[in-house]
Structures are given as C-alpha cells and as structure tokens.
Amino acid sequence: MFTISGVVLITRPVYDEGSLNYCQSGAMNNGILLESVEGNKPRYSIGGAEPIGTINANAVLTAATYAEDVKFTDADPLNGTRVAICNGEDTQQEEMGFQGGALGYFAYDVGRRLEGYNDLGIEDWAIPDLAGSSYEIGVSADHQNDVIVLIAHASADGNDVFITSSRQLSMVAGPTCCASGDVEILRNKLHYYGVIPFSQDDCGFNRLKDYLGSGDMYQVNLGNRNVGAIVMTLFQGYNQLRLMNPGPYMVFLDEANIIMASPEIVLADEANDLNTRPIAGTLMRLNEQDEDGVNAACLGQHHKDRAEHMMIVDLVRNDLGRVGRFGSVNVQEIVGAENYSVVMHIVSRVTGSLNEAFEAMEIIRAGFPGGSITGAPKVRAMEIIEELEPQRRDGWGGSIGYIAYRGNIGYRIAIRTLFACNGQLFASSGAGLVGDSMEDGEYNETFEKMRALRSFFCAAVHMGKTPYLS
C-alpha cells in the first residue's frame, strides 16, 4: 500500500471475474459497477462506492450536490454534471485505470432538453433524466495484468483521512465471496404493450413509411417496450444477466435501479483519442459455428442492413467531427460482424483526435443520444420517435458510463438494459427502419433482440445470502 498525490492504493490479484462485487457489500452504499465480461472488451472494469457528490435531473431542473449541500441547479443537465466532477482531484497517475470521477447515466430524454423539440410521449415511469455520483472510493480491475486496484482519495497531509481511507480499502479488498444457496425457478412472463409503431390499428408503421418516402429522414430506430414483475433483488438479477447474456459492457447501477449488458460504446475519450463503435444491422445467430460464419458474410453484404449501417457510420463521423481536430476523424474498421449471445451485429469503428478547445461535456453533447438508437438525420428522427412511440423512452437509448477527474470519458448505449421501477422491470428493443423495410421483419428484429432478456425472466437464480445479495 502506498500514497501518490493524495491517493491511497491497494492492489489485489483477481480471484475471479466477480471480484468487483464489493460494491454491494454491507459497508458500501449506492454502488456502481461497469464490468467487462467478454467480447471486444476494454482493459478495465471499474466500480465506485461511498459517493461524495450526486447529480440528479428531472424534466425541468438539474441539481448537483457535494458533501450533502446543493451546489448547483440549472436547466442544462450537462452543466450540473460538470459541477459534480470539478470538486475531484486529478491524480495524473498513468496505468492505474479509473482514479475517481462521476459515474452514472443520462436518460434518452435528456436529448429533448438539449435539442428543444416537443414533449409528446407519456411519462409513465418515475425515472430521473439523469442520475449519478462522484465517488470517494473507486476500483479498477486490470484485465491485462490480472490485478484489482482499489483507490481512495485522501489528503497526503491528513493522517486521519489517510488512515480511514486505508481501512476502508482493506475492508473491501479481502477474498472474493461467491453466490451460493438453493436454486429457485422464477417463471415470470414478459408481455408487450404500447407497441404503436408496429400496430396496424394505429398505422404507425405506415406513417413512418410516409416520412421516409417524403425525405423527412433516411432512417429511424423505433422501439417496443416489454414489462415483467420483479421477483429478485437487483444485484441477483445482475449476476444472472451476467451469466446468461455476457457482454463487453455490463453495468449495475444501484442508485438508479439499472442493470445492463450492452454491446455498444457510444463514445470514449482516452488521452484525447476519441473512439466510437456504432452498431446497426442485426441477424439471429444459429447453433452451428459454420452457419454463423456464412450468416456473418451475408449480413455484411445484405443491402438493407449495409445501407442502414453506412447511414449511422456517417452520422457518428459527423458527431465526432464537431469536437475532433480538423482532418483527424476516420473510419478505422467498417462493416465487420460481431457475435453476441443470441444475435450478430454489423460493427464499425470511428476514431479521431480531440480538439483541445473542448472538454468532456462538449464531447457528450456532440454525440448524445447515439446515432444507432435514433436515426438520420438525428434531430428529425428524434422528433418522429417522439410522435410515434407512445411512451417516453426514459433510460432506454440513453448512455451509462463515467467521466474521470482527469477528463477521460467512456459511455455505453443503454440497450439490452433492464430498469426497475414500482415493483416492475421494463426493457425495450428497437429496429432501424429505412425506405425498403418490411413491417414483419422489423418487428421480428425487436422481438429477437429481446430473446436473451426474456430468458432472464424465466431462469434459475441462485438465492444466496452473501453480503452483496441484500
């Protein structure tokens, strides 16, 4: 154990992939976990506990607090986030992963406040537009070196704070506990409701085709919502989702009652290198590996999916261009197929170098919400989504991630995501519609994207009694 620039560090070997579960131990409150489980995953999984500042926003006002005092209120949700992270210290330690900052989520509906279009959707869930915290204790699991680094911020001159921080870290740095106990079979059933965009009765699909035919937009992503009852603790649900639908961007966000297994990063900034990996174009996976390979080749050549994907690549390239240095934005990988638990997607990678005139909030503003969850052109697609989808999207289609004190950011699109509210879970899935889309095919795509999450509701869950399963 040692201190550098007011930071207490403890390293431990990674005993297993669940070592970050300390965030939900009895001593930790309002924990958050951003975990990389499999696939094209980043180097670090990160978590936080013991929040020292919070950010919350509703449809009108954003409030940032620090040490329990309200420090800032504003109509702009990004300004509140800026205030929440400015109290932290930039430790400037290389190769240490996440060293403190703000972790949380921006709901899709923050986009309405940023763009100023009409509010038409029904607000049927009491979910904040924004919820996050800045953390006193952080953890980074380094997948490259197979170690966990636990971090607490403390004044190098303040012995009392140093001792307290050291004790806190030592307490959570012990051997990993694992879930155990009897198995209970949970037989929840999801049901669809409010599927107006794909309903013949409302002709929502036909209205959308009219918009596409008239040139209002070239593509729009419409979604279906699914609802089921909560029959387990949220962290039990996270552990089960982690087993059944592992992905590169897993999230457990206790404060906002969110669990996620997203495959898509909307934007990241590491040392002024911008990176985004848009996903658009979907095909169901088959059981045989050889058939997967054939389908992957077909997916990349399918004219509808390829056109859908290229529109989104162009859109996110323009988004990065708003904050990138002139001439630095490039498409590094294009139209590659990636396999996930039940589907394969077309994925590309767009990169750029940050224009140093901009900082984290401007990067988020430039790319929010993600193009693959909205459409092209983005603002017009968002207006049409507001008209055709009956309820607000709330968290679905927003972003979950972190803004580090040192300025690095990493945000994932909130798809393959479950939200808990009022004793229920809800999840949504969408499909990108273009001029030659067929209604049945697009509806089936939204249904198949939910396959892993539907299985989640009917799975066997370990009802353990370990501290983090409270």
Curated annotation (Swiss-Prot):
Function summary: Part of a heterodimeric complex that catalyzes the two-step biosynthesis of 4-amino-4-deoxychorismate (ADC), a precursor of p-aminobenzoate (PABA) and tetrahydrofolate. In the first step, a glutamine amidotransferase (PabA) generates ammonia as a substrate that, along with chorismate, is used in the second step, catalyzed by aminodeoxychorismate synthase (PabB) to produce ADC.
PANTHER family membership: AMINOBENZOATE/ANTHRANILATE SYNTHASE, AMINODEOXYCHORISMATE SYNTHASE COMPONENT 1
GO function term, MF aspect, one: magnesium ion binding
Family indicated by similarity: Belongs to the anthranilate synthase component I family.
Reported cofactor(s): Mg(2+)
Source organism: Lactococcus lactis subsp. lactis (Streptococcus lactis)
Alphabetized NCBIfam families for the sequence: PabB-clade2 (TIGR01824)
Miscellaneous section: The catalytically active amino acid residue K274 of the E.coli enzyme is missing.
Pfam families found in the cross-reference section: Anth_synt_I_N, Chorismate_bind
Pathway involvement of the protein, from the record: Cofactor biosynthesis; tetrahydrofolate biosynthesis; 4-aminobenzoate from chorismate: step 1/2
Catalytic activity as recorded in UniProt: chorismate + L-glutamine = 4-amino-4-deoxychorismate + L-glutamate
Name of the protein: Aminodeoxychorismate synthase component 1
Assigned keywords, A-Z: Folate biosynthesis, Magnesium, Transferase
Assigned EC number: 2.6.1.85
One GO term (biological process): folic acid biosynthetic process
Transmembrane regions: none
Subunit structure: Monomer. Heterodimer consisting of two non-identical subunits: a glutamine amidotransferase subunit (PabA) and a aminodeoxychorismate synthase subunit (PabB).
InterPro entries membership: ADC_synthase, Anth_synth_I-like, Anth_synth_I_N, Chorismate_C, Para-NH2Bz/anthranilate_synth
